[in-house]
Curated annotation (Swiss-Prot):
Coiled coil: none annotated. The gene is ctaB. It comes from Acidiphilium cryptum (strain JF-5). Belongs to the UbiA prenyltransferase family. Protoheme IX farnesyltransferase subfamily. Pathway: Porphyrin-containing compound metabolism; heme O biosynthesis; heme O from protoheme: step 1/1. This is Protoheme IX farnesyltransferase. PROSITE patterns: UBIA. GO terms for biological process: heme O biosynthetic process. It catalyses: heme b + (2E,6E)-farnesyl diphosphate + H2O = Fe(II)-heme o + diphosphate. Its main location: membrane. Keywords: Cell inner membrane, Cell membrane, Heme biosynthesis, Membrane, Transferase, Transmembrane, Transmembrane helix.
Amino acid sequence: MSDTILRTSATAVPDTALLDQSLLGATAGDWLALLKPRVLYLVVYTGAAGLLVAPGGINPILGFTAILCIAMAAGAAGAINMWYDRDIDAVMRRTAGRPIPTGRISPDGALAYGVALSALSVLLMWLATNLLAAGLLAASIGFYVFIYTMWLKRRTPQNIVIGGAAGAFPPVIGWAAATGHVGLLPVLLFAIIFFWTPPHFWALSLFASADYQKAGVPMLPVVAGQKATRLAVMRYTLWLVPLSLLPYVLHLAGPVYGASAMVLGLAFVWYSWRVLRDRQDGNGVSLTRDAPAKAAFKFSILYLFLIFGALVLDHLV
């Protein structure tokens, strides 16, 4: 791992001139990019699902505010992540075009933006819904920033496994915003996202391993190799499928969800099997330019959209 990268300071003394320059020179698109909008879609979607399936319902305006707070919090955490990871983002092809490495936004501007949005999202959630939802929202930000970004990401190949908890909070927060408590169903939804995260990100890391290695990030393919990563993708997918059926088995969801979870789960297993059986050279490197891994990565996103959509549909019918 590059000593230069690891020694790069993530806590530089604020430069007022740079901060002013970033505030004046950056476009709205640059500030939006700091929020990682591609990630926000799934966060908002799963948070809304948790809110919609919660018993009792919620005032539409308060519900919209709760989802907005979840989106703001996720975006804020993403901005702080980009601030802290600006050194490795600069050397990875996939992230080199982000606003901080390109100089469109200063590190201090990004940090101030992320902290302000974090505080605003938690305060607004508290005022609009309840203290539990606000506390869970704050915990999700803290987990992503301090546990995943600052502690795990550069230290262990299990960064995605443990850090996946940060992305699993939204349906729990949505449920808590509507009810003021946490039940068994949102806990199961948390677990589904938690076990979905490793095969999703490890599929990505299989075809982006050179980037991670260059940046010194110990993703599983970099540390354990391609073969071990392919096996891990399959293993977590096999754990995910029976777990995803528990809401139906425990009578927390109906047949629409149960049938959807089974079909989608079998499809996910098939995509993971293709990753496992991808043609490789003697070092486990794909001979197909990681086509199965790319397909599995794309399907994993569709999987989460569809299974949570089935849950909401089941609740409505």
